Amino acid sequence: MSDPVIKRALVSVSDKTGIVEFCRELSGMGVEIFSTGGTLKSLQDSGVSASSISTITGFPEIMDGRVKTLHPKIHGGLLAVRENPEHVKQATENGISFIDLVVVNLYPFEATVARPDVTFEDAIENIDIGGPSMLRSAAKNNESVTVVTDSADYALVLQEMREHNGATKRTTRLTLALKVFELTSRYDRAIASYLAGAVAGEQQGAASKMTVTLERELDMRYGENPHQSAGLYRLTDENGTRSFGDFFEKLHGKELSYNNMLDIAAAVSLIEEFRGEEPTVVIVKHTNPCGVAQAPTLAEAYRRAFSTDTQAPFGGIISFNRPLDMEAAKAVNEIFTEILIAPAFEDGVLEMLMKKKDRRLVLQTNALPKGGWEFKSTPFGMLVQERDSKIVAKEDLTVVTKRQPTEEEIADLMFAWKICKHIKSNTILYVKNRQTYGVGAGQMSRVDSSKIARWKASEVSLDLHGSVVASDAFFPFADGLLAAAEAGVTAVIQPGGSIRDNEVIEAADANNLAMVFTGMRHFKH
């Protein structure tokens, strides 16, 4: 069959970007336009000739607009096969006219449920019924009907209509139909995820079923290694939709890689532990923090974080909890770093940093969401757990030794505990004056992690006397604690819970250490 000429269009959009201009062009080509509610008003107010959908259905919009396009004269006009004589006969007998073009986008359900103040009633009212129905009918009959869901496609449709005497090409109609089913499937999954979250709110633990939608946001050259394909996907689950662009904007530098994304997630997750606190700097390498410090100025915090490990920061990722000022930027600029992440860049800083073309500069535009689910793929299924976002306050600490920690020790212990949960297990972390002094990460033995942390401190001549130590899980034996005491530690923070806790406490008392239990483990695999 020849490509059908577009004579009648049905237009109903929530996102009115470019719709007036598009419909004005359609009208100029002789297309008869029918519309609904706010879209009709926008067109008529702009002087575009358009009629109410009620002139087709002979029925008013009712129930606060919930019922307006669910009618045989609409769906018959969309679904009728033009080459089928029986369809044409039935359409004629029932006063149904063909509709050649459908321009519809859906109620903004995902944006609505992403609002922190959204109510269940608001969410339900933003579930579109008529829109998906029209889109699916039009897309099913793509032999005859052109269907548009995205304002970015308006120009393509107009161009083809001009070049083909008012018609669109078959390949274009098929491509646009594909976009419909991708859109409606994602839309339905978002609704199902939200409702699953509502049900889960009445339940304990993870739901028996979860609906998760992944939509590619960014292509990547490769994954962790050049032989691995990769991409970044926008994720929609019961907590709404999350994407890189919701929280970050790359201002300068090469495209972000798979490994860059992992490091950004690690660096920002840690720096947000210190949101609103004194100037803090986090340096990350291969997702592990290699230096973290607080100080009166950002520049001083950076220098102190860098002094923890003066080799690892080269090619690393640095995040800041304050706008990056010129003094700190000049200090950072002395070495090559892959990525700098800040909530803002003060005047002149970007211009200076952009002189190194390969360095990525990333603006954090919003805080990362707290809580929700964390997904980890395995060859045999998907592991799902709550994010490790619970906070331990000073009031939650239980002092288990004879000696109480001093206020200065408590400040260092709390600082260390915030960092500890962001380091790969087994973790031993030494901290002094709100600066990491030795990081022992990712070892199979807690004793080995302790040895590495002490060795790293000695490599840069950091004196551990007067420091505190944090362990992400309990000390199974007293040996790890005794090694810390030998290094000069005065206070310890750990979850507790070992069957040998009493032995560890006795060892702490024997060495005049103050030790607190958090009652919360922070394994990180």
Curated annotation (Swiss-Prot):
Its EC number is 2.1.2.3, 3.5.4.10. Transmembrane segments: none annotated. The keyword Hydrolase applies. The keyword ATP-binding does not apply. SMART domains: AICARFT_IMPCHas, MGS. GO terms for molecular function: IMP cyclohydrolase activity; phosphoribosylaminoimidazolecarboxamide formyltransferase activity. Residues 1-149 form the MGS-like domain. InterPro entries: AICAR_Tfase_dup_dom_sf, Cytidine_deaminase-like, MGS-like_dom, MGS-like_dom_sf, PurH-like. It comes from the Bacteria. Pathway: Purine metabolism; IMP biosynthesis via de novo pathway; 5-formamido-1-(5-phospho-D-ribosyl)imidazole-4-carboxamide from 5-amino-1-(5-phospho-D-ribosyl)imidazole-4-carboxamide (10-formyl THF route): step 1/1; Purine metabolism; IMP biosynthesis via de novo pathway; IMP from 5-formamido-1-(5-phospho-D-ribosyl)imidazole-4-carboxamide: step 1/1. GO terms for cellular component: cytosol. It catalyses: (6R)-10-formyltetrahydrofolate + 5-amino-1-(5-phospho-beta-D-ribosyl)imidazole-4-carboxamide = 5-formamido-1-(5-phospho-D-ribosyl)imidazole-4-carboxamide + (6S)-5,6,7,8-tetrahydrofolate; IMP + H2O = 5-formamido-1-(5-phospho-D-ribosyl)imidazole-4-carboxamide. GO terms for biological process: 'de novo' IMP biosynthetic process. Keywords: Hydrolase, Multifunctional enzyme, Purine biosynthesis, Transferase. CDD domains: IMPCH. The IMP cyclohydrolase activity resides in the N-terminal region. Belongs to the PurH family. PANTHER family: BIFUNCTIONAL PURINE BIOSYNTHESIS PROTEIN ATIC, BIFUNCTIONAL PURINE BIOSYNTHESIS PROTEIN PURH. NCBIfam families: PRK00881.1, purH. This is Bifunctional purine biosynthesis protein PurH. The gene is purH.
